[in-house]
Amino acid sequence: MITKADKNATRKKRHARVRAKLTGTAERPRLNVFRSNQHIYAQVIDDVNGVTLVSASTLDKDLALNGTSNIEAATKVGESVAKRAVEKGVKEVVFDRGGYLYHGRVKALAEAAREAGLQF
């Protein structure tokens, strides 16, 4: 009998492998992305102190969204997290794609964050 691999379990393994090499510092924190079926979340994290510096998601009330699980929503979340990070004085980050492929919503969020002023 053939068993189908759980995509989320393989993503978590992939993320753990990447996280073993990636750490965010106060000077260059980690931009983490989490993608669910309904929403997308982004956090700028200082791993040394264990502190989330900035966050944004499609659940934020100040973002005017038509849908929460599309590329346009991911773009707005990327712009929002980048603006909030620049306001806090963070210009450079390490991008953590969370084990997801750099494609679609994850790519849209990353490119929007770059255009809004974050460097990675």
From Swiss-Prot:
Q: Which SUPFAM superfamilies match?
A: Translational machinery components (SSF53137)
Please give the superkingdom of this protein's source: Bacteria
Q: What's any one GO cellular component for it?
A: cytosolic large ribosomal subunit
* A single MF term (Gene Ontology): structural constituent of ribosome
Q: What InterPro entries does the annotation carry?
A: Ribosomal_uL18_bac-type, Ribosomal_uL18_bac/euk
GO biological process: any one?
translation
Decide whether keyword Ribonucleoprotein is in the record: yes
Keywords from UniProt, A to Z, are: Ribonucleoprotein, Ribosomal protein, RNA-binding, rRNA-binding
Q: What does this protein do?
A: This is one of the proteins that bind and probably mediate the attachment of the 5S RNA into the large ribosomal subunit, where it forms part of the central protuberance.
- Record-linked PANTHER family: 39S RIBOSOMAL PROTEIN L18, MITOCHONDRIAL (PTHR12899), LARGE RIBOSOMAL SUBUNIT PROTEIN UL18M (PTHR12899:SF3)
Assembly = Part of the 50S ribosomal subunit; part of the 5S rRNA/L5/L18/L25 subcomplex. Contacts the 5S and 23S rRNAs.
Homology family = Belongs to the universal ribosomal protein uL18 family.
Q: Tell me what this protein is called.
A: Large ribosomal subunit protein uL18
Q: Which organism is it from?
A: Bacillus cereus (strain ATCC 14579 / DSM 31 / CCUG 7414 / JCM 2152 / NBRC 15305 / NCIMB 9373 / NCTC 2599 / NRRL B-3711)
What is the gene name? Answer: rplR
